[in-house]
Amino acid sequence: MKRIICPFLCILMLITTISFAACGKKDGETPPSLKFGLGVYTNVTKASDADGDTNGQGKVAITAAAVTVGADGKIASCVLDVADITVTYTSEGKAVANDSFKTKGEQGDAYGMKAYGGAAKEWYEQRDAFASLVKGKTLEEVKALVADANKGTDEVINAGCTIMVKEFVLAIEKAYANAADSSANAANTLKLGTHTEQSCKDAVDDKNGQNQTETTFFAAAVDADGKIVAATSECVQVKFTFDNTGKSTYDMTKKLQGKREAGDSYGMKKYGGAAKEWYEQADAFNAACIGKTASEISGLMGADSYGNADIKDAGCTILVNGFVKAAAKIG
């Protein structure tokens, strides 16, 4: 009898083990979807007068954060960058064009925190350390990482980030608030591209000149094949003004918002007669990017810098070159 029961029990145990194993996660099973959002914090730090041979300056730091957030309210992934922009104008009221614009992250080692500032790590390395640190934290836990003088707590410093982090946190706070249901998941890679364009106008008689920049941010979750599964964007316009003597006429008390952040108050429908508001048109462009690689997005733009026929039919009639050039950088 024992000889019959023993083999039977062994077979039963084997079947049970296989059954339990089959109940686990299957190979290739898609991870749960995550919320996805982009936040931008803008800080104008200077608008000085020109004086003789010394040009006047307009300075602005635009900090962007993209995050994915799990069902538990914790940040699953985060990417950060800062567009640190300086424009100038002369004492004759002439705007000076910049050769190019690069974010702090794009500058890499050339930013020079190690070479010129004596820092142990370059800016992008410290940025990455902070972005890694916020993973797995709630928003309140992230906000608690800011200490005196806008620098990080000991936890932040020990992680390798000794730079000021307050504006990172302010951008993350906006990204968290903007996070919405998406097709992004933990298997995807979060990416952020930035493109800045400049337009200059000299002062003439009693008409102010301007040195204006428009910085477009394109954030995306990308799958293993490099295809976009979720996308969003923002654009910040900063217009530094001055008179024909190079004296700044920029209002430093003015609160700046991104075009998406401004919502309906941006006024494309009310004042420009557009069928859709800026954020609605941007959403139409972003939707057209789903399933495409960064290089394929360039095909969405025509020779006139507007969208192709499909983009226009989808409701995006604004210039899309900023979106396309920012998106190209996530490749």
Which residues does each PLM region occupy?
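Active-site- and interface-proximal helix/loop "cap" or "latch" segments in soluble metabolic
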Residues: 30-331
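Sec-dependent signal peptide cleavage junction
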Residues: 16-32
